[in-house]
Amino acid sequence: MQFKISSEYKPSGDQPEAIEGICSAIRQGSDAVTLLGVTGSGKTFTMANVIEKLQRPALILSHNKTLASQLYVEFKSFFPNNAVEYYVSYYDYYQPEAYIPTTDTYIEKDLSINEQIDKLRLSAASALMSGRRDVIVVSSVSCLYGIGNPQDFHSQTVQVHVGQQISETRLLYHLVDALFSRTETDFKRGTFRVRGDTVDVSLGGSDEAVRIEFFGDEIDALSLIDPV
């Protein structure tokens, strides 16, 4: 799928010249191009048009979570039919371990992870690993820290399609290898449940779950369901 802006506005003023100048510089291999403009001059909209013209995946970096969140919402509105993802640190609170010599006090490491942001991070990683080109990732400096080897992500991918010849037992083994946990009651992200010939998988990077229906050793149907 190609990038396609959804907006009632068109570039105006100095924006068309800026869009063309940036696109031309990037096509010619420039390492850096600077877009100048006062607050409210439409720099985000200008860059959205650059992305649409170049048709390349984009990484949008912000110096803090607040601005990253704002940019994510704006790019999401400009590209509602493309993969606009959000990737920032998932810590609500982080206390590193410490030692106070004067009082001989050891402070253990303590942290709190935001489940919603963790889900968005997984969604971003999934979009990048999917091979699609229409991906925009809005991130803070958190993206500088590695989250693992891409080959490990690929090796833990479970691919299914209607008509696939695979036993239900074999699929369950694949899900466990991909670090999903079986449950019958607490159906949440990263878990799966089995009900007869039906396997429901709650995705790690989405609010939806996948229902896989079997007929013998063949996948008969696939559908998205509400985990709740």
Describe the residue ranges of each PLM region.
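ASCE RecA-like P-loop NTPase motor cores
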Residues: 1-228
